[in-house]
């Protein structure tokens, strides 16, 4: 009848995953086909930090990307997943600085720039492959031969090209403006690297004496100025009030004497001032506050910088005009007592001196957010420094229009509003960083400080006609990491060369990323790409057609995962498993705070008492896809992961059941498809339709759900059972039909599920392919199932649906009445429609086999029925006679005890939830859990009461 076939009892992911991946990679299956007649499909991966390691966010986004890549490859598209890593300037430099400090007791300055950069390249060579290897473990079908690094020669050339061209167009300039300054790391940092920490501070109320005998409306000769930053008051160049604040309108245009510094500064009116904050009078320090900087520009105020790059008080103030150039003629001497003081020491002294002069009005407690550098760990300072800037407004206008016109779609659409709000209020972008690791700015200076911009020094001399005797020194700064990653989609494809890859794969199709970098990365990619990449008609190209924005992966309590919270989960641990001891070491091993380490250890022991079991890559991927509801943050759920590992096992066991069935007959000959055969093929066709529609809308959760629902609830729970009577009692034609249907539906199901769960589907498919006459090497290159327009069998679907309802009703009667599954029952129908009577007539044998029935009878309209338990299916009444099956009194006594037990539980929880003290103190999650239990007990109680009534009526 069929070949003898053996298959392991269980699927063992660790035994097959890495070998399968190696085979795929070595066979070149991840490479584009480069078939110019096929549509191209390309995704550029958001480049992770080269020295980093994979976290759950990476695993989540990359699973979604690989699903799309595998799907499009199976669709026959010329598919490229462009991978690579980011040099991650400040992060990588700090890792290596800490390393040499710990191991050698040295700083980067001990090495010097060139030697230190070589040290970083060594570190990159040593650790840079970690994340690539971890990405392989996820099953990512990446063309690794095309892997790029943001400081590769090719990408470095692209960076220089963009810088030089923008400079030539007047869109890059050097100027002195206010930036986020990290006084520990001595570099400007981006807003993304600033962490605003809640802090309990103070609001100091200082008296600033009015000059020239002026008085307030209530006769005072001073204004009370509220500030959270006394240490910068030596740099005040005005005090401001709201123009409509009647308390101070008469003083606008007059002056106050700045205490301690003894210089007069004007009283100005500006709508920036909040009349309700403090006294409604604020000091304006344009050199040390971003809001004040804007006020200063509006009122043409001088900028007085009183801090050094270490955030100490300067010996001499630096006076700058609103044009960023030194300003002559403005006196702002720093009193000798404060020179050289560290900023917070200066704060204490200034407050004490105000008090000594009788000018400290009051101090109020004040909650505020203090900006910290996320790498340096100290409060950042708004600082006037010389930096390079991109004038981005002209680039932003084009980038806004691309989204407005629908050339780029955001999914979910609401993120367009976030994009527009940022882009329409865009400021010039500070692109220089005071670091050593990164793309060094292609600008050179001569002895007089003249600036020359070109791709290299040789070009500088040629472009500006400089003699070899002119000594040139390259700018020490490097570019913001976001500058090079902004070129990612086109620089990785060979730009500025017009390569065949650029022509074939650009624009890319979709970008999958987090909402937090829409401005820092997504917007800049759109701006740069549209400025530099044009199609054959000269029209600006977008970098991607769709931006799919994911939420964050949080822990089970909804907390953001972070090392300091000790709740980080490593995706590799989900795949391979990890012991409790190793997990504790991972979470607390390098912690300097013993109390925090103990708190984390306690929580970890409670949550993972036995460590984390191995689940395999497919279970992890399926879970991530199933949780991917559009744009929402996701609370990780270990139970879902276990459930989807069980799902993978279910798929394996079902395949084993099919392929090891000794009665399977795939020989040539007459075939007679049963109702069940027609139904499962129609259901599969519908599942393909659901999957394709869902994927086109980036609803990965619905894709996973469609596969789960079909595999578990239709194929395994029903169809496999429906074939058993055929193999037991069917004729040869029916057995051949069931055999063909089983193996063909299974093979197509594996292809359908492959983009989500690549390893188990490949492993099973290698065993199935011989049964369906396929000789190809890999499921990866097989066509993805199509929706067959004529493949929907509505009649079969309706008939099986009715039969399933009847079978479930009979099984429920058995369970509720404690009748063993092995005992045959009689089934009576009353009020059966003509349509359902026809189904019953054709499928009586199937119904008897599936519901374990001895007799099936349709009662006439007025025919009396024996004492029976009844269920409704639609309008039809199903009756199962109970004579001889149960001891009525004993069963009622047992159910009475059950009812009492459930009633007591419901009452206990009701009392708990009506206790105001409990509800006020208990966490929301605990209350929700109690309500869940209450609903479960209430539902159980109602079911038992129904059973009681049914048996009482016998």
From Swiss-Prot:
User: What reactions does this protein catalyze?
Assistant: tRNA(Val) + L-valine + ATP = L-valyl-tRNA(Val) + AMP + diphosphate
GO cellular component labels: cytosol
* InterPro entries, A to Z: aa-tRNA-synth_I_CS, aa-tRNA-synth_Ia, Anticodon_Ia_Val, M/V/L/I-tRNA-synth_anticd-bd, Rossmann-like_a/b/a_fold, tRNA-bd_arm, tRNAsynth_Ia_anticodon-bd, Val-tRNA_synth_C_sf
Taxonomy, top ranks, is: Bacteria, Pseudomonadati, Pseudomonadota, Gammaproteobacteria, Pasteurellales
- From the Swiss-Prot or TrEMBL record, give the protein name: Valine--tRNA ligase
Give the E.C. number(s): 6.1.1.9
What is the similarity comment for this entry? Belongs to the class-I aminoacyl-tRNA synthetase family. ValS type 1 subfamily.
Q: Where is this motif: 'KMSKS' region?
A: 560-564
Q: Which residues form a coiled coil?
A: 883-953
Task: State the span of motif ('HIGH' region).
Answer: 48-58
Where is this chain's protein located in or outside the cell?
Cytoplasm
């Amino acid at each position: 009848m069929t070949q003898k076939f053996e298959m392991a009892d269980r699927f063992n992911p660790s035994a097959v995953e890495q070998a399968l991946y190696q085979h795929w990679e070595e066979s070149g299956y991840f490479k584009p086909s480069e078939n110019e007649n096929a549509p191209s499909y390309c995704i550029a991966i958001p480049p992770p930090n080269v020295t980093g390691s994979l976290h759950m966010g990476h695993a989540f986004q990359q699973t979604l990307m690989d699903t799309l890549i595998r799907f499009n490859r199976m669709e026959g598209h010329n598919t490229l997943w462009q991978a690579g890593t980011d040099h991650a300037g400040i992060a990588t430099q700090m890792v290596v600085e800490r390393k040499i400090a710990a191991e050698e007791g040295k700083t980067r300055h001990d090495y010097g720039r060139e030697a230190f950069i070589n040290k970083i390249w060594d570190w990159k060579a040593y650790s840079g492959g970690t994340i690539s290897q971890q990405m392989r473990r996820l099953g990512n079908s990446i063309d690794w031969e095309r892997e790029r690094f943001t400081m590769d020669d090719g990408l470095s050339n692209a960076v220089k090209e963009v810088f030089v061209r923008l400079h030539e167009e007047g869109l890059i300039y050097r100027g002195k403006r206010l930036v986020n300054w990290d006084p520990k790391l001595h570099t400007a940092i981006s807003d993304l690297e600033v962490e605003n920490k809640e802090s309990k501070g103070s609001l100091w109320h200082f008296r600033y004496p009015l000059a020239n005998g002026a008085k307030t409306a209530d006769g005072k000769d001073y204004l009370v100025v509220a500030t959270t930053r006394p240490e910068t008051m030596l740099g005040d160049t005005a005090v401001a009030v709201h123009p409509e604040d009647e308390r101070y309108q008469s003083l606008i245009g007059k002056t106050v004497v700045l205490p301690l510094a003894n210089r007069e500064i004007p009283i100005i009116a500006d709508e920036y001032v909040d009349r309700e904050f403090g006294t409604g009078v604020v000091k304006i320090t344009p050199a040390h506050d971003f809001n004040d900087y804007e006020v200063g520009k509006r009122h043409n105020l001088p900028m007085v910088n009183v801090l050094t790059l270490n955030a100490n008080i300067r010996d001499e103030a630096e006076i700058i005009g609103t044009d960023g150039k030194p300003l002559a003629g403005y006196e702002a001497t720093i009193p000798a007592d404060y020179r050289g003081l560290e900023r917070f020491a200066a704060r204490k002294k200034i407050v004490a001196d105000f008090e000594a002069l009788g000018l400290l009005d009051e101090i109020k407690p004040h909650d505020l957010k203090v900006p910290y550098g996320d790498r340096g760990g100290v409060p950042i300072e708004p600082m006037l420094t010389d930096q390079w800037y991109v004038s981005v407004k002209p680039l932003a206008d084009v980038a806004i229009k691309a989204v407005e016109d629908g050339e780029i779609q955001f999914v979910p659409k609401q993120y367009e509003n976030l994009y527009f709000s940022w882009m329409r209020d865009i400021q010039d972008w500070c692109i220089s960083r005071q670091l050593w690791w990164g793309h060094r700015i292609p600008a050179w200076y001569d002895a007089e400080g003249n600036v020359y911009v070109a791709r290299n020094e040789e070009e500088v001399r040629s472009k500006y006609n400089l003699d070899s005797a002119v000594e040139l020194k390259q700018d020490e700064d490097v570019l913001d990491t976001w500058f090079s990653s902004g070129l990612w989609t086109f620089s990785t494809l060979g730009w500025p060369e017009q390569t065949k890859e650029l022509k074939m794969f650009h624009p890319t199709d979709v970008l999958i990323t987090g909402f937090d970098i829409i401005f820092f990365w997504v917007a800049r990619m759109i701006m740069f790409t549209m400025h530099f990449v044009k199609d054959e008609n000269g029209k600006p190209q977008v970098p991607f057609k769709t931006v799919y924005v994911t939420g964050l992966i949080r822990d089970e309590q909804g907390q953001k995962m972070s090392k300091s919270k000790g709740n980080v989960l490593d995706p590799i641990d989900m795949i391979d498993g990890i012991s409790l001891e190793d997990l504790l070491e991972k979470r607390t091993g390098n912690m300097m705070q013993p109390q925090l380490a103990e708190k984390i250890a306690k929580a970890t022991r409670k949550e993972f008492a036995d460590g984390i079991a191995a689940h395999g890559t497919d279970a992890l991927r399926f879970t991530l896809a199933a949780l991917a509801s559009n744009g929402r943050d996701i609370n990780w759920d270990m139970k879902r992961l276990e459930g989807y590992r069980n799902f993978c096992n279910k798929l394996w066991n079902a395949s084993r059941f099919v392929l090891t069935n000794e009665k399977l007959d795939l020989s040539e000959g007459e075939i007679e498809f049963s109702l069940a055969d027609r139904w499962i093929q129609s259901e599969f066709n519908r599942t393909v339709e659901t999957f394709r529609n869902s994927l086109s809308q980036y609803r990965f959760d619905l894709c996973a759900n469609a596969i789960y629902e079909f595999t578990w609830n239709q194929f395994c729970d029903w169809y496999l059972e429906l074939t058993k009577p055929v193999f037991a009692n069917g004729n040869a034609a029916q057995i051949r039909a069931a055999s063909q249907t089983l193996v063909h539906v299974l093979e197509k199901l594996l292809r359908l599920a492959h983009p989500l769960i690549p390893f188990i589907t490949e492993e099973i498919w290698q065993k199935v392919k011989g049964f369906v006459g396929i000789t190809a090497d890999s499921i990866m290159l097989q066509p993805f199932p199509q929706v067959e327009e004529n493949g929907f069998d509505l009649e079969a679907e309706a008939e099986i649906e009715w039969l399933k309802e009847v079978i479930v009703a009979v099984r429920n009667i058995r369970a509720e009445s404690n009748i063993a599954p092995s005992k045959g029952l009689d089934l009576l129908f009353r009020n059966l429609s003509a349509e359902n009577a026809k189904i019953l007539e054709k499928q009586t044998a199937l119904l008897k086999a599936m519901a374990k029935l001895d007799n099936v009878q349709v009662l006439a309209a007025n025919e009396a029925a024996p004492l029976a338990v009844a269920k409704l299916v639609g309008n039809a009444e199903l009756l199962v006679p109970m004579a001889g099956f149960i001891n009525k009194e004993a069963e009622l006594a047992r159910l009475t005890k059950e009812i009492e037990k459930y009633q007591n539980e419901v009452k206990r929880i009701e009392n708990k939830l009506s206790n105001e003290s409990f509800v006020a103190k208990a966490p929301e999650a605990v209350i929700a859990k109690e309500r869940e239990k209450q609903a479960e007990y209430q539902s159980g109680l109602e079911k038992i009461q129904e059973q009681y009534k049914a048996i009482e009526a016998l």
